[in-house]
């Protein structure tokens, strides 16, 4: 479990586009999302430092909850907690659940906002569609009052020449997730070549949404239910893992059913079916031609055998006739 305070230089860290934040001593943000969506990179953009290990790959980099902090120019402390990828919960992984629940220790004064991170570079997976259920299972219904959706890889929209609204029009599942958090969302571009000004703007927009969350919750942070002896107790973890396993089983069956239906009706499947049909017809035609050729060969062989027999008989008759003529010729000479 890592931790640390990253100081931001007042001269270079503050961008002209940023406004001073209300003087709340500190804010705590928690990053949640599937592996490879850019959670750690988003945390680094917020902290303005390479505080968390981050790699552009699907394999999980974050194995345990980590807390890193930065001091903003107005003196406010921003705490960012990075968590293991939710993807590792499927099939349910008790150790990952236990690790995520450690937020209760790292955020003892509560959480001001939960940042649910999705990547715009990839389609929404079945696991990601189940995120609302997983969050509800892990933290309870009230967690949605603190949820903000962060879309990473904003540059992919520019590459595809589409707006975020156009992108969401084709993603009804995203709309459902956004509806659960009152459509609070922000776009992030975490590339190294992204300008400091752009990064400052996106972080400021995020912090504006955090303020909105605070106002809606009367400045009360999300507090964990500590009625249990420990959030990571075996009983609590087992109960949550059981619910997630049951959910995953249902999703898997539905996913396989959808996949089979999609595959059967896909253009590729139809092409394959056409190829199989054509191949079958060709094989049938080849078999017919082969059978016809075999029949022709049989008839030719039979004719050859019959002709050979007739030639043999004719030859024998000629030989006998020749002998008869020779005998007659000899008889005539004696007389």
UniProtKB/Swiss-Prot annotation:
Query: Its domain of life?
Result: Eukaryota
Swiss-Prot/TrEMBL keywords: Coiled coil, GTP-binding, Nucleotide-binding
**Residue numbers spanned by region G5:** 189-191
Query: Region entry G4: which residue ranges?
Result: 152-155
Q: What is this protein called?
A: Immune-associated nucleotide-binding protein 11
Family from the record: Belongs to the TRAFAC class TrmE-Era-EngA-EngB-Septin-like GTPase superfamily. AIG1/Toc34/Toc159-like paraseptin GTPase family. IAN subfamily.
Coiled-coil region? 279-331
Q: Which InterPro entries match?
A: G_AIG1 (IPR006703), GIMA/IAN/Toc (IPR045058), P-loop_NTPase (IPR027417)
Region G2: start and end of each range? 60-64
Q: Specify the species.
A: Arabidopsis thaliana (Mouse-ear cress)
Q: Name one Pfam family in it.
A: AIG1
The record's region (G1) falls at: 33-40
* Induction remarks: Up-regulated by brassinolide, nematode infection and cold treatment. Down-regulated by aphid infection, 2-aminoethoxyvinylglycine (AVG), high CO(2), isoxaben, and propiconazole treatments.
Whichever gene encodes this chain, its name is IAN11
């Amino acid at each position: 479990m890592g931790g640390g305070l990253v100081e931001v230089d007042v001269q270079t860290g503050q961008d002209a586009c940023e406004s001073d934040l209300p003087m709340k001593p500190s804010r705590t943000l928690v990053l949640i999302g599937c592996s490879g969506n850019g959670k750690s990179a988003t945390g680094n953009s917020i902290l303005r430092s390479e505080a968390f290990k981050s790699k552009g790959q699907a394999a999980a980099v974050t194995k345990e909850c980590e807390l890193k902090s930065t001091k903003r120019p107005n003196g406010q402390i921003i705490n960012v907690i990075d968590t293991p990828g939710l993807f590792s919960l499927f099939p349910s992984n008790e150790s990952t659940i236990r690790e995520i629940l450690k937020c209760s220790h790292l955020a003892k004064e509560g959480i001001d906002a939960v940042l649910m991170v999705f990547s715009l570079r990839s389609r929404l997976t079945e696991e990601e569609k189940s995120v609302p259920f997983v969050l509800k299972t892990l933290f309870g219904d009230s967690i949605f009052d603190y949820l903000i959706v962060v879309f990473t890889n904003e540059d992919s929209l520019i590459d595809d020449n589409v707006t975020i609204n156009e992108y969401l029009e084709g993603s009804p599942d995203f709309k459902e997730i956004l509806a659960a958090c009152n459509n609070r969302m922000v776009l992030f571009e975490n590339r190294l070549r992204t300008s400091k000004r752009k990064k400052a703007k996106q972080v400021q927009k995020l912090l504006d949404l955090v303020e909105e969350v605070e106002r809606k919750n009367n400045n009360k942070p999300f507090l964990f239910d500590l009625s249990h002896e420990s959030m990571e107790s075996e009983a609590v973890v087992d109960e949550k893992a059981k619910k997630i396993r049951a959910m995953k089983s249902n999703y898997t069956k539905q996913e396989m059913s959808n996949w089979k239906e999609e595959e059967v009706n896909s253009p590729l499947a139809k092409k394959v079916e056409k190829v199989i049909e054509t191949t079958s017809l060709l094989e049938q035609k080849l078999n017919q031609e082969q059978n016809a050729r075999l029949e022709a060969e049989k008839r030719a062989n039979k004719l050859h055998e019959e002709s050979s027999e007739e030639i043999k008989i004719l030859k024998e008759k000629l030989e006998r006739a020749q002998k008869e003529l020779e005998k007659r010729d000899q008889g005539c000479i004696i007389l």
